[in-house]
Each structure stands twice: as C-alpha cells, then as structure tokens.
Amino acid sequence: MGDQRQRSLSTSGDSLYIVLGLDKNASPEDIKKSYRKLALKYHPDKNPDNPEASEKFKEINNAHAILTDATKRNIYDKYGSLGLYVAEQFGEENVNTYFVLSSWWAKALFVFCGVITGCYFCCCLCCCCNCCCGKCKPKPPEGEEQEYYVSPEDLEAQLQSDMEKEGDGAIVVQPTSATETTQLTSDSHPSYHTE
C-alpha cells in the first residue's frame, strides 16, 4: 500500500476494515464472523440506554454491507469511500471512467485541445459553418447538379408566374363529406359502399 495514496475513510474517519476489526486481506468468512460478533455486542436491543452503541451498530452494518458485496469491496479497496460515493451517483460501472476523466492528464488534454482550437471555436466552424462559410466545402461529384441559394423573393416571383401560366384554375369549393360502411360476412365477399 506504499505506492497507493491514502484514500478517504468512512464517515467516522475509520477504515471499514478497522470498524470490523479486520485486515484488508480478510476472507468473506472472516468478515461474516467479525460482523456477527460485533453486531451482537452493539445491537440496540442489548444496549437500550447507550445511543453510541446504536451509532456503532449502524457503522458495523454499513461496513458489512460494503465488504460482503464483491463489486463494492473492489471499488472501496481501489478508491475508498469517495469511490463508493461516485458509484452511488454515477453507477458502479462508471467509477473507473470518472476517475480517469478527473485525473490531471485528462484535464490537461482537454485544456490543450481547447487552446489549440481557440476554445474549440475551430470545431464549431467546421461543424456548423462548413469551414470558412462554405469556401472549403467539398465539390460535388461530376454529373450532379450544383446546389445554389435562391432568395425567397425569387421563389415568390416564380410561383406567381407559374400561376399566371396555368390560368384561372383555382379551386373555390370545399369537397363534400363522404361516409363509408363495410359489410363483412363469412359467406360473401366484402363490399364497400357509401350511404
């Protein structure tokens, strides 16, 4: 444990292993035995006049719940109680990702990329503005029609001229409503008729 830095401990400041009186390499059977012994000693029913025993019992239960769950124990062994807090907030499968992204080199990489792209301004230009307002836009393949901008006024004028060419063919009457019924019988073909 000399190469690993000291992690934050339980809420009382003691390691969960110390709460149960165990070594970090304790087996699940050792954890169970120690928990039972301490739970009997500090159970609130056996110590009704001692509120400290009740608090100690809660800590023992918490330590037992974490150390008997293999995933939580692994997280606790690697990252301490901060790892357990992160597991509660983001899920047990995202703990490693959280600590990788919160490392100094990930933050430095993010800052470096921000600096070389002008606070990510270049990325916005490439994605949103098609690089230099379309000047660097890729050319369409041979044989395809080139896209161009048409102003709304030109479109309006074209629509007016098309309507004048077609003549006075405007529809001025609403369609009448129609009802349809279906008769399905087992001995005949379905027939559709309006009433």
From Swiss-Prot:
Keywords, in A-Z order: Cell membrane, Chaperone, Cytoplasm, Cytoplasmic vesicle, Lipoprotein, Membrane, Palmitate
This protein's record includes keyword tRNA-binding: no
Pfam families reported in the protein's UniProt record: DnaJ (PF00226)
Domain J: from-to ranges: 13-82
Gene3D superfamilies the UniProt entry points to: DnaJ domain
Record note on modification: Palmitoylated. Palmitoylation occurs probably in the cysteine-rich domain and regulates DNAJC5 stable membrane attachment.
Xref: CDD domains: DnaJ (cd06257)
Domain of life according to the entry: Eukaryota
InterPro entries named among the record's database cross-references: DnaJ_C_subfamily_member5, DnaJ_domain, DnaJ_domain_CS, J_dom_sf
GO biological process: chaperone-mediated protein folding; regulation of synaptic vesicle cycle
One GO cellular component term: cytosol
Biased composition (Polar residues): 174-189
Topology in membrane: Lipid-anchor
Ranges where the record places region Disordered: 162-195
Main location: cytoplasm
Location of the protein in the cell: Cytoplasm, Cytosol; Membrane; Cytoplasmic vesicle, Secretory vesicle, Chromaffin granule membrane; Melanosome
Annotated function: May have an important role in presynaptic function. May be involved in calcium-dependent neurotransmitter release at nerve endings.
Family annotation (PANTHER family): DNAJ HOMOLOG SUBFAMILY C MEMBER 5 (PTHR44027:SF1), DNAJ HOMOLOG SUBFAMILY C MEMBER 5 HOMOLOG (PTHR44027)
This protein's name: DnaJ homolog subfamily C member 5
Organism, scientific name: Tetronarce californica
